[in-house]
Amino acid sequence: MMEDTIAAISTPLGEGGIGIVRVSGPGAIEAVKNVFIPRQSKDLSKVPSFTLHYGKIVDPADGKIVDEVLVSVMRAPKSYTGEDVVEINCHGGIVAVEKVLELILKQGIRLAEPGEFTKRAFLNGRIDLSQAEAVIDIIRAKTEASLKLAGRQLSGELREKINAVRQKIINILAFIEVSIDYPEYEFDEVTPETALKNIDEIINDVRRLLSSYERGRILREGITAVIAGKPNVGKSSLLNALLRKKRAIVTDIPGTTRDVIEDYLNLKGIPVKIVDTAGIRETEDLVEKLGVEKTREYLNQADVTLFVVDVSIGIDEDDEKILSLINKDKSLLVINKIDLLQGKVNFEQYAVKTGIKNFVPFSARNFEGLEILENKLYEILIPEQEGEGESALISNLRHKNYLEKALNSLLSAKESIASGEPVDLVAIDLNEALRELGAITGDALGDEIINEIFSQFCVGK
């Protein structure tokens, strides 16, 4: 339990119905009591936990009313932080909320650092580190699927799986320690064959977790899809079609889009940052030149490229130049303006000419082929469809890195057993794997790394 008490505004500043000032620590109730006058004569220090009280916040210096509020009291240890927590629900807006916070801080309360409320929940043992990280993922979730994944992690599902793997390692280590302490006895549990079988089982557990990372990463972080092509092939029209709204200006004049336009698309639960770029061509226009350079930068960073060509023109030298800038394996060829066709066209010849195997005939004018385009894009991102994220559990790069380190230690332990190394050397590798897995839940992690993780949070959380 922390000795000092902290406070911060927990809602975004700006006009709104409600603004919340959160106070946590041993002095939370007393601090609020000093500035809160309840409608009924109540002693805030004696009210039950999980109760809500109507009253007024008053400036003790002059007795003037600042705001009408609702005050909720949540006593330790059953609160968000595991400490006494008081939340003051006042009217939204900048001045009122900041004034309430100012009065609380004058009671000897410290302004909270970014993520400090959640950090206290972790340090007080209410949640583990993976659950704390899930809190920020919930805040940042852009789709229902990414929210669902973060919710599973917050509920402790990842912690349970990690702890189950750690317990298997501990069981092996226990038998190894016994065999080291009592070498005169023979134990069936620590024969090389049994140990190899048990370690293989643990290795498979870790690999299963690791195999879910790529899908989990996409759900958590989203992907960047860049629309590329020469001027006037329908890139902006494609953006508008995907978003189902007029986000970009569309004209028949080449070079209308001079800068990148970004927006977000929910593609079957995947957060997709869709980027409409300036058409790549040789130009003397300075502004358009800068837009073309920015397009090149985005193409280098793209997870997938939607390469748009005009079917009424075909593939020409300008298209070939752009093709040299993109990753064809992570691209979707959009053969646009099929509404202008008079006869049959062999669309596969476009795939052969461009070297992009994934293609879709499309009309940005009447949206023909839009659903097929979205399905193709999804297949490129998720080659093996696994549903809406049920099997994905690892989504954080930090978790992936520690799982890989643990896997390497387990493989080293397996190799040591197979080559007949002494069991105490095997124990070194197993203990290392145990530490790496513990770092995911925060059981074996230094203060500097913990502080860095919580610094990513906003103030008030």
Swiss-Prot record:
Entry GO MF terms: GTP binding; GTPase activity; metal ion binding
Binding site for K(+): 232, 251, 253, 256
BP terms from Gene Ontology: tRNA methylation; tRNA wobble uridine modification
Domain of life: Bacteria
Principal localisation: cytoplasm
Record-listed (6S)-5-formyl-5,6,7,8-tetrahydrofolate binding positions: 22, 87, 126, 461
EC number: 3.6.-.-
Cofactor binding: number and manner: Binds 1 potassium ion per subunit.
Domain named TrmE-type G: residues: 222-382
Binding of Mg(2+), residues: 236, 257
GO cellular component terms listed in the entry, alphabetical order: cytosol
Compartments where found: Cytoplasm
Assembly and oligomerization: Homodimer. Heterotetramer of two MnmE and two MnmG subunits.
Functional summary from the UniProt entry: Exhibits a very high intrinsic GTPase hydrolysis rate. Involved in the addition of a carboxymethylaminomethyl (cmnm) group at the wobble position (U34) of certain tRNAs, forming tRNA-cmnm(5)s(2)U34.
Alphabetized HAMAP family for the sequence: GTPase_MnmE (MF_00379)
Family designation: Belongs to the TRAFAC class TrmE-Era-EngA-EngB-Septin-like GTPase superfamily. TrmE GTPase family.
Annotated protein name in UniProt: tRNA modification GTPase MnmE
Provenance organism: Carboxydothermus hydrogenoformans (strain ATCC BAA-161 / DSM 6008 / Z-2901)
Gene: mnmE
